Regions:
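C-terminal motif of bacterial Sec signal peptides marking the signal peptidase cleavage site
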Residues: 18-20
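Extracytoplasmic beta-rich repeat domains
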Residues: 25, 29, 38-65, 93-118, ...
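Structural signature of WD-repeat beta-propellers
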Residues: 75, 128, 168-169, 213-214, ...
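Short coil/turn segments within WD40 beta-propeller repeats
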Residues: 78, 131, 171, 216, ...
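Short loop/turn segments that connect beta-strands within beta-propeller blades
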Residues: 84-87, 137-140, 177-181, 223-226, ...
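Loop/turn-rich, solvent-exposed surfaces of beta-rich toroidal or solenoidal domains
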Residues: 300-309, 316-350
């Protein structure tokens, strides 16, 4: 089945219109088989454990975060766990379904966490498909406050000084007081008839939240009052049906210096002036994955799992890799001289940033990886669909050869 069918969210459309996504008439696109590679880097799992039951086959952007000397992890069912960053020892665990039993009594499917984990201001923030936003004490896991957002929370909250902001699936971008959970303001964007299932997390800079919208724009929302400073279309759709007019901006805008970079589904990768939103350059790429960057290069995984390196000064393509096409790749992360992406079969692939060649891989969990790997120093943190949490580290060819030689001598 085409990947976009699995991620659609209908708003006011008939079931008959969407039935094409499960129809045998929809041509399946082949998943690229893994081919033999010339490995020059050798990833190893240095630590792993399980948290809850994972996210299963559901859409989710839950991913671990590291701060305050701790690794924070959540699962879909409402379990949040803190581990010591160095030793891996479990420090505390919180089960929201027990904590919010009364509030969730009428919600037969539970909390369904899908947004987070964000750690800031000595707190840990997570959100769910019920619209519940929760703040925990980072040291103890105690629930400090909870608040109800106007719609599903499908992307990580953004904390800026005294405000925590969330982007809902109903097109409402809302700000809450970081210490009390009081709702401060709401910015409404237009929600098209058909969108991808997902929302953009916001970036924050100089008093403004920069957030992508479902109608293909980037908006700057002033932290102090929730008003829009400017809006700029990334892509203006003109297709003849709802599918071709989809233009969601579901990634976090990437801010580098005085410029902002972002891509839309069905649309463009653009560079904008941060202050005005003026488009500096625009190139045709379709993506809903987070951008990665290093030096003067942007790295993009498109909607068919093709990987690109683009010069951020002018948008010129430096290289592309389609050997992992349709493997439902995660967004890329940068680790040393490589990109790392996960796939539907639970492999992490390591790609040489200079030329796009795949130079290493390791299978973490056959149930699959779904969210962008988190890189902290020399450690790569990943979360699988089954709930496995793993730390992956790299060994270079020279080290590997030396180890093999020593083993042979023994």
């Amino acid at each position: 089945m085409k990947s976009w069918c699995k991620n659609l969210l209908a708003v006011g459309l008939s079931v008959a219109f969407l039935s094409a996504c499960s129809s045998s008439d929809v041509e399946e696109e082949p998943v690229s088989e893994l081919v033999e590679i010339q490995a020059t880097v050798f990833p190893e799992i240095s630590w792993d454990t399980n948290v809850g039951e994972g996210v299963g086959d559901y859409y989710s952007q839950l991913r671990p975060t590291v701060r305050y000397g701790k690794l924070f992890v959540a699962d879909r069912s409402g379990v949040v766990v803190a581990f010591d960053e160095v030793t891996g020892e479990e420090l505390w665990s919180q089960n929201f379904n027990e904590e919010f039993e009364q509030k969730l009594r009428t919600k037969t499917k539970g909390l369904r966490l899908a947004a987070g984990v964000t750690a800031a201001r000595k707190k840990v923030f997570v959100g769910g498909e019920t619209g519940l936003l929760v703040a925990l004490d980072e040291a103890t896991g105690e629930v400090l406050w909870s608040a109800q957002a106007n719609g599903e929370l499908l992307s990580a909250p953004t904390v800026a000084e005294d405000v925590v902001a969330v982007n809902t699936a109903k097109g409402a971008f809302e700000g809450f007081n970081v210490d009390s959970g009081e709702k401060l303001w709401t910015y409404e964007s237009q929600l098209p008839n058909l969108t991808l299932r997902g929302t953009s997390s916001a970036a924050y800079e100089a008093g403004g939240f920069f957030v992508g919208t479902a109608d293909g724009k980037v908006a700057v929302v002033v932290k102090n009052n929730g008003q829009a400073a400017w809006e700029q279309p990334v892509f203006s759709p003109s297709g003849g049906n709802e599918f071709t007019r989809m233009a969601d901006v579901d990634m976090t805008p990437l801010i580098l210096g005085e410029n902002l970079y972002v891509a839309s589904y069905n649309g463009n990768l653009v560079s904008m002036e941060l202050r005005s939103g003026r488009i500096i350059w625009s190139r045709k790429y379709s993506s809903f994955n987070e951008l990665a960057e290093a030096g003067l290069s942007l790295y993009l995984v498109d909607d068919h799992s093709r990987i690109y390196s683009v010069d951020r000064r002018n948008g010129l393509e430096l290289w592309s890799n389609s050997t992992l096409k349709n493997r439902e790749l995660t967004a890329a992360a940068v680790v040393e001289g490589y990109l790392v992406v996960g796939d539907l079969e639970g492999y992490l692939h390591f790609i040489d940033r200079s030329n796009g060649d795949v130079v290493g891989r390791i299978q973490v969990d056959s149930e699959g990886l779904y969210a962008q790997p988190l890189v902290v120093d020399d450690k790569i943190y990943v979360q699988s669909r089954s709930g496995k949490i793993a730390i992956v580290t790299l060994s270079k060819q020279e080290t590997k050869v030396e180890e093999d030689t020593n083993a042979s001598a023994e």
